[in-house]
Every structure is written in structure tokens, then in C-alpha cells.
């Protein structure tokens, strides 16, 4: 009954989108619901097939270590791409030709009263949209390759930049803006209001395409965390878009409409995946979903022209990466898996540890470890000679356990997601308040 009601709602939303405005966003909601239903239906039906072909893993944080299907993130990714292809006529509905005399002439078009010339088809927007889909397709393929062949970090770290090439090329051809604004207090010294970064701006965008997927992949290992953080990021991005729809100038609304129509269907398929991946999980998402989801946010930030704001929403992921650097760069021994340790006796998660007795850290880093311990940023274990013999692994997940003590897996995940949401809200407030003070204006308002 619920599915019949949902299908009826989808039909009404899509029909409404053809006859009323704002058509693109209304249709996006309809396709988001459709994506949720399709993903929710497919996941339980394909799980056993994934296990049969060897795509499975053991849940180390459960008694008995049950075997669960892995790489299930490929299902919502495939559904999302399929939905976004079907969505094309709806986002460009107002430009569609309904009468033509041939020879490429547009005689009569569907017209929406929005102050735009509907006879001029926005090929630049279509190329951006298609490049985004092509970029995401390439990312999904790379993610599946990683899940199948278990690529080493040094090999897969830069792969998202290769997948982002279509996106960067279309940005260069259709938009090509590489100027960044200078804070007002620096304008007097530099005698200019902006700086052209040229090629370095493309390096920055490629770096963002590398960072977003990998940052989600690093902050993982707890049931529901990979998908949960992406749902929180999607909600925060939509809140930012809503600010521009309600308060922003007309010039910025198209970019944020583009952002919203990419995010809403993504939110739909992610909610369906989260239903099966949250504690106690029945499926694993795999690296495929982490790459796919991260690239969605990179694409939205780049093509929506608010990449700096998007990076602010990734503050917990940035902190997690910086916090992990001593282990990632081998200053401190780094186990292959740094997941929190599950205690079967009480069912709680404890910080996992790196053994420093067998493989001591670099001598220059020992005082830093003790400083971090004093700041309560890590937990150290000492022997009778006051020598360090182990440290908690340096991830945001383990740090949460160091701060708040052992907790059940679902509570641990919810704590990190609440932290992500609160920091994201503060980041948005800071972006639109402090940014306006530093630069003298913001896209939402101007400071005089």
C-alpha cells in the first residue's frame, strides 16, 4: 500500500512539474522518491548474488562476525545514474520544441514565464549536466575496480582526478573563470579586487575531486557512518541552496538550482542504502559508494560555484585527515585497519591501538605524542619504565571513543553524525556572516 501511494505521489509530482513551476525541483523530489523505492527494492534482492561471486566481508563488530554482502554501494550509484538520465527532459522542459518546420528551426517551444528567452537552448548547462554524469560514471567504475582488486592507497589516491577530467574540460570550455576575490583589507595593498589563479585553479578543483571521495573513504568502518555522513552533507548542502532560493540574488539561483537537482535524487538513494547499512547492518557499502558520494559533492561544489562553502561542510573530514597524517605518513605505525575494537563481553566499541613496542615511532615524534596525550587527543599506554608501548589509532572515530568513552556502535555513529551536522551549521553561519565582513559582501547580502 505504501509503495502504491509513493508511486502515485511520484506521478503527481512529475506531472505537476510539467505544468507548474519551479518544475526542475519538483521533478527532482519525485525522482528522489523513485530512486529511494528502486534502491530499497533492489538491495535485499541482489545481496546473495554478491556473496556468490565473492563480494562479501565479515562484520568484525558483531558477535560471530557474520558474513555480509559488500560493494552494495554500486546499487544506489547505478539507480542514481539511471534516474539522472531520465531526468534530463524535466530539467530542460521549458526549452523543449513542440513544433518545427524542419531544418533545425525551433518554431514553437514550451514557454515558462520566468523572464528568460525559452527559444535559446542552454547548451552550456546541458554540457555541464552530462559532464557531471560522465564524471560520476567514471568514478563508479573506479570504485568497483577498487572493491574487486583491493587497490593500494598509493595507486588509488589520485584516481578520482582522472574521473574528474570531463568535468574540468567542460568547466574550461563553458565557464573558465579562474579569478578569486581578495579580502577587502588586502585590496589597498594589492590594488586589485581579485587574483587570477589560472592553471592553479584547475589544480585546486582536481584536488577537491581527489579529497572529497577519499575523505569519506577514510572516515569509515562503523555501521551506517559512510552513508550517514553523506546524508548529513546532502542536507547541509540543500540548506545552503534554500538560503539562496529565499534570499540570494537571481544570478546565483541557477547554480544552486543545479546543485539541488543533483543532491535531491542522491539523498533519495542514500536514504535507502542507509536503511540497510545502519546498525545492525545487513550490507556493506564498499569503496564504490564512498567514491561515488564524494564525487557527487565535488561535482556540486565545482559546477554550483560554491566549492569553498562545500569544503567548509567537510571540516570533520578535513580534521580526520589531518589527525590521521602521522600514521598515513608513517611517523607512527599504521595498521592496515584502524577500526575501533569490538568487545564481545559488553558489546561496546573501544579505541583500537597501534603497537609502538615492536615498531617504535620516529624519535622526533615521541614528544609530540606525549603532547597530544596531555591534550587528550590520543590515549597512550606506558610500561614500567615510562616508555610508550601503544597509542590509540589516529582517526576521528577513535578520538570520539577517547573523549566519550566506550559506547555501542550505533551510538558511536550517531555521535559522529551529530558532530558533523552541528559543525556544518556553524560553518554555514560563519561562511555567510564572517565572509561578508572579510570580503565586504556575500552572495546573500552586502556589508557597507
From Swiss-Prot:
It is found in: Endoplasmic reticulum membrane. UDP-N-acetyl-alpha-D-glucosamine binds at residues 58-60, 70, 223, 336-338. It comes from Saccharomyces cerevisiae (strain ATCC 204508 / S288c) (Baker's yeast). Mg(2+) binds at residues 217, 287. It holds the Pfam family Glycos_transf_4. The gene is ALG7. Disulfide bonds: none annotated. Inhibited by natural nucleoside antibiotic tunicamycin, which acts as a structural analog and competitor of UDP-GlcNAc. This is UDP-N-acetylglucosamine--dolichyl-phosphate N-acetylglucosaminephosphotransferase. Its EC number is 2.7.8.15.
Amino acid at each position: 500500500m505504501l509503495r502504491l501511494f509513493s508511486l502515485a505521489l511520484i506521478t503527481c509530482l512529475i506531472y505537476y512539474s510539467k505544468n507548474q513551476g519551479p518544475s526542475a525541483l519538483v521533478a527532482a523530489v519525485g525522482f528522489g522518491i523513485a530512486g529511494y523505492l528502486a534502491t530499497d527494492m533492489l538491495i535485499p534482492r541482489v545481496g546473495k548474488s554478491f556473496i556468490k561471486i565473492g563480494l562479501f566481508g565479515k562484520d568484525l563488530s558483531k558477535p560471530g562476525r557474520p558474513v555480509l554482502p559488500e560493494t552494495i554501494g554500486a546499487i544506489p550509484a547505478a539507480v542514481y545514474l539511471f534516474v539522472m538520465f531520465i531526468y534530463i527532459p524535466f530539467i530542460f522542459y521549458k526549452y523543449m520544441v513542440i513544433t518545427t518546420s524542419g531544418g533545425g528551426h525551433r518554431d514553437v517551444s514550451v514557454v515558462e514565464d520566468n523572464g528568460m528567452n525559452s527559444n535559446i537552448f542552454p547548451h552550456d548547462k546541458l554540457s555541464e549536466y552530462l559532464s557531471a554524469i560522465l564524471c560520476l560514471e567514471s568514478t563508479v567504475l573506479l570504485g568497483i575496480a577498487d572493491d574487486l582488486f583491493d587497490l593500494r592507497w598509493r595507486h588509488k589516491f589520485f584516481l578520482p582526478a582522472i574521473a574528474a577530467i570531463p568535468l574540468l574540460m567542460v568547466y574550461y570550455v563553458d565557464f573558465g573563470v579562474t579569478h578569486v576575490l581578495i579580502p577587502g583589507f588586502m585590496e589597498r595593498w594589492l590594488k586589485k579586487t581579485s587574483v587570477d589563479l589560472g592553471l592553479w585553479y584547475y589544480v585546486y578543483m582536481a584536488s577537491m575531486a581527489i579529497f572529497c571521495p577519499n575523505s569519506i573513504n577514510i572516515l569509515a568502518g562503523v555501521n551506517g557512518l559512510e552513508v550517514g555522513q553523506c546524508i548529513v552533507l546532502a542536507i547541509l548542502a540543500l540548506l545552503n541552496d534554500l538560503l539562496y532560493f529565499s534570499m540570494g540574488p537571481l544570478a546565483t539561483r541557477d547554480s544552486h538550482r543545479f546543485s539541488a537537482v543533483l543532491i535531491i535524487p542522491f539523498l533519495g538513494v542514500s536514504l535507502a542504502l542507509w536503511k540497510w547499512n545502519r546498525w545492525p547492518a545487513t550490507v556493506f557499502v564498499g569503496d564504490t559508494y564512498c567514491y561515488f558520494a564524494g564525487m557527487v559533492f565535488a561535482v556540486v561544489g565545482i559546477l554550483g560555484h560554491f566549492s569553498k562553502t562545500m569544503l567548509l561542510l567537510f571540516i570533520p573530514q578535513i580534521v580526520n585527515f589531518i589527525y590521521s597524517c602521522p600514521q598515513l605518513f608513517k611517523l607512527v605505525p599504521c595498521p592496515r585497519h584502524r577500526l575501533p575494537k569490538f568487545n564481545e563481553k559488553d558489546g561496546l566499541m573501544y579505541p583500537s591501538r597501534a603497537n609502538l613496542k615492536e615498531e617504535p615511532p620516529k624519535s622526533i615524534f615521541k614528544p609530540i605524542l606525549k603532547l597530544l596525550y596531555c591534550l587528550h587527543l590520543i590515549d597512550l599506554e606506558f610500561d614500567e619504565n615510562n616508555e610508550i608501548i601503544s597509542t590509540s589509532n589516529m582517526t576521528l572515530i577513535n578520538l570520539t571513543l577517547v573523549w566519550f568513552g566506550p559506547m555501542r556502535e550505533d551510538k558511536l555513529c550517531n555521535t559522529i553524525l551529530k558532530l558533523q551536522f552541528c559543525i556544518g551549521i556553524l560553518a554555514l553561519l560563519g561562511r555567510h556572516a564572517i565572509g561578508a565582513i572579510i570580503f565586504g559582501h556575500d552572495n546573500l547580502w552586502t556589508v557597507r
